[in-house]
Amino acid sequence: MYYRARHSLPYQKRMENLTWRMMYINNKSIFTNTNNAPKEIFEQSLDPEIDDFDYVAHIKKIGQFNQQKTQQQQDHLQSNLDNHNSIFADNTGFSNNNDRGSSGGGMTSISSLSKKRPAPFSPMIQPEKTTIIPTATNTMSQLSQQLNEFNKFNHPSQTSNFNDVNHHMEISTSHIAPTSSAFEFSLDPLAFEGPNQNFQPEPHHDFNTNSFDSMTSSYERPLFDDFLPRDHHNIQSSSVPTSASSFSTIVPKNTQFSTSASITSPTSTFSNQGNNSSNFHRLNSTVSITATPGNLLRQESMVSLPDYANHLRSMSQTPTMNSSNAPFSHSFNDGGSYFMNNFTGITLPSQPSPQPIHFDNKPKDDHFNTSLSVSQQQPSAKKSKRKSTITKSKKKAASPETTITSTGSTITTKSTNSNSTGKGTATGPAASNTGVSCTNCGTKTTPLWRRNPQGQPLCNACGLFLKLHGVVRPLSLKTDVIKKRQRGNNNGSGNSSGTTNNSNNYNNKSISKKNEIDDGDDLNPTSITNNTGLTNNNNSKSPAKSKKKSNFDNNSNSALNNLDKSKLKINTNEITNISETTSNSSSPVINLNHGGRSSGVFGNTPDYLNGITSPAVSLVKSEIDNPHQLNNSNSNGMLMTMHQSSHQSSLSTTFDHEVESNNEGSNSSGVNTSTANNQDWDWLNMNY
């Protein structure tokens, strides 16, 4: 009769719960026999259809009124009690020996509904004995008794149906031994605050009258009466009220799911008085559910149980289990499938829909510690507002190992793509062909990728300009010189395609120190005179070079170190022409035409010479103090141009131009005569 109670509508559909209507009819019949009762007030307060129906005030009024009119009610309730006991005995199979006391209360109008309830049972305890308790001579109805206990009106003059000294309870200790596991969790302790006398000891009682089938909250007693006898059976028999017959109005303060022998008494204990020789311990191996009408649950409660009332009836028909680890008809060792399948409607107030329940099943010492957790699906991560133009390279032959940084940019840390000679490994973002382009200037090659506040990728120049000035870098500042940052992948000198050096542009600091270093550095190499045909390996460095290392080499990872000097063989017999010319700066230029070579000794990559192994070059070295510059201008011979410039700050290589796809910024002879004015942009591209 309770399974149709709604769990989320506290006031709108109360009429679907027959308990409210039956209690109203019963209380109305009680109050009609009283002369001094304010009949209109109680009828209005008992009307469950009133929207502002106050349960607490209603209960208190009933309790106060029952305290004053207890004796008048007993005569009327005794006749109803006899009728109820006779009907109950027919339904449950127990004999009516006039020993029921006040088991049925005064709610005789709903005794016909007892057929919906199965025989009384205890899910984990088998009935063995039945102890008949004589009827108390001066008894009260359970309703009156509960109201008195609820309002703390436990007067010694008022007798209870359990205050007979001859009453005794035989407790089988085989099912009382406590175990180590507990299956409970706390709920809202502030739901309907009020007096609590469940565990208050009463004199001359074998056990507390309210501790057998009540909650820690005392408010449930006046609203819902028990329909099964409580006073004449032992625990081994079927005196434990079923979950469908004794409902708590308010969620108990300490537990909703409890492991107790009593379905509705998770923490009840027998007072150690009278003939009782042992306390009643909780059976932690059994799981019992306190059925609470959902329409009485407050929104502050932690858990609401929407649909498990349908399963309570099936639970009440479950055969008796012998295994202490098998609550209901299943064991928790099977993964909690029964509970997950039948009780998946446990929701929190903030949840719109029930979430799946997961069990952590790890039996320990033949006991189970099942932790019930309502798994809330984590909301997916918010989609980033950043618009990224990063596209993943689908070339599996390269198989790069990428790393996603915290900002979302993809950095290739290891790649099998190398240059044409197979030397070197791409180890930087400038070398990875990931398709990343600057959203401002559109460049795809930069020593350092940056991001704007929106998360879009920017090159180092645009990103640093935005960081320093706070505005977007104007495209007018972007010149063709910035394309010299690119490093070609087709050069045959073995240069690493991923080095982020600055060999094409010299910063002011390295240029200012050029004059301070006289010899042995990359800008002013000292000529080394050796025998003809001597082969220099790039792994063996000259003593002068090993002693001093220029600032330029520290900043740029100089491509000069990667020069394969083993390919350099200059013979004096092959020099066919030595001519001296004058450049625009009136500096002598000596062209050494290296003939007889079908292909240049350097392939496609010109570079500076740290040392020349030809005596012929050493003859003209005395006239040239500035760095030598080598250019492979044609395929039939190699033109080595040694250019002395008065503008030392404008020194650059043709390598910077030949790696470009359009060869912008280079003249026909391959010699760059650009001045320092073209290097004003360089401060944007330096790594500080």
UniProtKB/Swiss-Prot annotation:
InterPro entries: AreA_GATA, Transcription_factor_GATA, Znf_GATA, Znf_NHR/GATA. GO terms for molecular function: DNA-binding transcription factor activity; DNA-binding transcription factor activity, RNA polymerase II-specific; RNA polymerase II cis-regulatory region sequence-specific DNA binding; zinc ion binding. It comes from the Eukaryota. A zinc finger (GATA-type) spans 438-462. Residues 259-271, 402-428, 488-510, 529-543, 552-565, 639-654, 662-678 have a biased composition (Low complexity). Residues 382-397 have a biased composition (Basic residues). SMART domains: ZnF_GATA. It is found in: Nucleus. Residues 359-368 have a biased composition (Basic and acidic residues). Induction: Expression is induced by rapamycine. GO terms for cellular component: nucleus. It holds the Pfam family GATA_AreA. Residues 369-379 have a biased composition (Polar residues). One of its GO terms (biological process) is regulation of nitrogen utilization. Keywords: Metal-binding, Nucleus, Transcription, Transcription regulation, Virulence, Zinc, Zinc-finger. PROSITE patterns: GATA_ZN_FINGER_1, GATA_ZN_FINGER_2. Residues 83-125, 259-278, 343-438, 482-565, 639-678 are annotated as: Disordered. Transcriptional regulator of nitrogen utilization required for nitrogen catabolite repression and utilization of isoleucine, tyrosine and tryptophan as nitrogen sources. Controls expression of the MEP2 ammonium permease, the DUR1,2 urea amidolyase, and the transcription factor STP1, which in turn mediates SAP2 expression, a long-known virulence attribute of C.albicans. Influences the filamentation process depending upon the nitrogen sources available. Required for virulence in a mouse systemic infection model. This is Transcriptional regulatory protein GAT1.
